[in-house]
A protein has these predicted regions:
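Catalytic and substrate-binding regions of cell-wall glycan-acting enzymes that process beta-1,4-linked
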Residues: 96, 107, 136-167
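Membrane-interface motif at the C-terminal end of an N-terminal transmembrane signal
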Residues: 17-34
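Active-site/pore-lining binding-face segments in mid-to-C-terminal subdomains
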Residues: 118, 122-147
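Active-site-proximal beta-strand/loop segments in catalytic clefts of secreted hydrolases
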Residues: 77-82, 93, 136-138
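N-terminal Sec-pathway targeting helices
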Residues: 1-16
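Short, surface-exposed glycine/acidic/tryptophan-bearing loops
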Residues: 83-105, 152-156
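Export/targeting segments at the very N-terminus of extracytoplasmic proteins
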Residues: 32-84, 106-125
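Residue-level detector of well-ordered alpha-helical segments, enriched
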Residues: 69-74, 88-89, 129, 133
Length: 167
């Protein structure tokens, strides 16, 4: 039993750290926009064709929440979460009251963008950095609270400590 708990804790720590790492790698060297003004085609983003299919809808939905400048982060999250596959490409409907038939990519994107916008607002209010927001997308909004009283900036060690506190 102790070994199973250890494995679960390790996975709780490693997966979100992996998610943040992949998002960071995907965004390294990415300019804010390509030459034609399109952040989806900016060099280095490495999006699958499936994720690119959702780019316009993600951008439109982000604009509705006044977070259009975070479109590339949302697309990177989708790429890491599912590669754009399935009815929940943002992995945002797991705890929703929707039936499997009601879960659609558009509902997933709407829920994810709304959640990301809320996380951005919370981080802004508490003075936390964008990396904390990205990590909180996976860990939950409580990670921003946790970060806000521990230096306000996401670090690898902070995310490990947070994950360990949940085991």
């Amino acid at each position: 039993m102790k070994r199973v708990k250890w494995i679960i804790c390790a996975l709780c720590i490693l997966f979100p750290v992996f998610l943040l790492f992949i998002c960071g790698v995907m965004l390294i060297g990415v300019s804010d926009e390509s030459e034609d003004g399109d952040p989806v085609h900016a060099s280095g983003l490495g999006l699958s064709d499936k994720v690119r299919e959702y780019a316009a809808f993600v951008g439109d939905t982000a604009a509705e929440y006044n977070i259009h400048e975070y479109e590339k982060y949302l697309l990177a999250i989708m790429m890491v979460e599912t590669g754009g596959e399935g009815n929940d490409p943002m992995q945002s409907l797991g705890n929703s009251s929707l039936t499997e038939e009601e879960k659609t990519p558009s509902e997933s994107i709407k829920a994810a963008v709304a959640y990301f916008a809320m996380l951005l607002q919370k981080a802004d209010t508490l003075g936390c950095d964008l990396d904390a927001v990205i990590q909180a997308y996976n860990y939950g909004a409580g990670y921003i609270d946790y970060t806000s009283v521990r230096g306000k900036a996401h670090t690898f060690q902070l995310s490990c400590d947070f994950a360990s506190s949940k085991c």
